[in-house]
């Protein structure tokens, strides 16, 4: 038996928003007991609906990613710890869904479709709130998603859209503790500055990545060139966010002209500090405030830094805690860089290629508490303890 489907369910008024949250709560209860085959079937059905109805290529690409998530291991029911009490009872800590997750977003809706894979795979109901200028496109895409869900055993209310621009509705959404279990605000700095201090619902802080690539004295020039170009030409939203290169002075005179040629061919605008500009006079000059700024793709900053200590200090001052890289043949320097740099991801002598569904995730948490890094289904779960005296009666 398939779930009932109501097209174009729009939550625009305050009362409609509260009703949508109640429906999400009910859907979350059904998702809690849905098995992996049912959740995977829902992902595949949504992918089919997107491919058959979507006109643009971006939603079809999102459909392919949904199929990828359907082929990943089930995050639910995994035993994390097992203990035995003195009375002989056995205790197991299992992964379970979080419940209702609200995603607030400013990006085009097809970007947020990429989140549906891990969210539904982890058994969560999803409330989407789009920016005003994306309402029409979001309504169309969510309608397609719900149509796909209606052919499965997963309720179509597992995915709903909130279109209300009323401040009272937004405030209710971010303070509906107990009804909404988690917020993921994919919004600009202005709205983020409002949401984070006012929200009583737990949230995952998502910051745009500002990563650094440190080229140590023993860096492989070809690998350095490849990684710089990759990070500057990768598709938008892929999470590869290196826009500052730090170069050891021993290799600056040889490496910077080589990088300049490759970057010019790729039409990438480069600015350098005084030391870098002394080697490459045609480069623009970096202002002091530029180092901590998130720059658009196709813009690169270069600094000549006197060694590992200076590079780590620069990263601590200007990084966002997203992704940091080092290229070096010195194992001690590699180990020290990994230990000292505070970031969700640290890479050594490797291209940051997002070749798994999780590392292609749109959402990358840079907060101190877990989850940190790319958000896959496992990171979008919580846990429960189940205790029984002599045999396992859980369905996990």
Q: Which functions belong to the PLM regions below?
A:
Residues 5, 11-15, 106-107, 121-122, ...:
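ALDH superfamily catalytic-core signature
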Residues 2-64, 304:
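N-terminal alpha-helical segment of soluble enzymes
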Residues 79-222, 253:
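Rossmann-like NAD(P) dinucleotide-binding subdomain of oxidoreductase/dehydrogenase enzymes
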Residues 36-41, 153-159, 234-242, 267-275, ...:
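Flexible, glycine/charged-enriched surface loops at secondary-structure junctions
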Residues 59-120, 337, 347-350, 361-362, ...:
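Active-site cofactor/substrate anionic-group-binding motifs, chiefly glycine-
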Residues 249-341, 345-358, 362, 374-375:
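NAD(P)-dependent aldehyde/semialdehyde dehydrogenase
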Residues 2-8, 14-26, 72, 329-396:
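C-terminal segments
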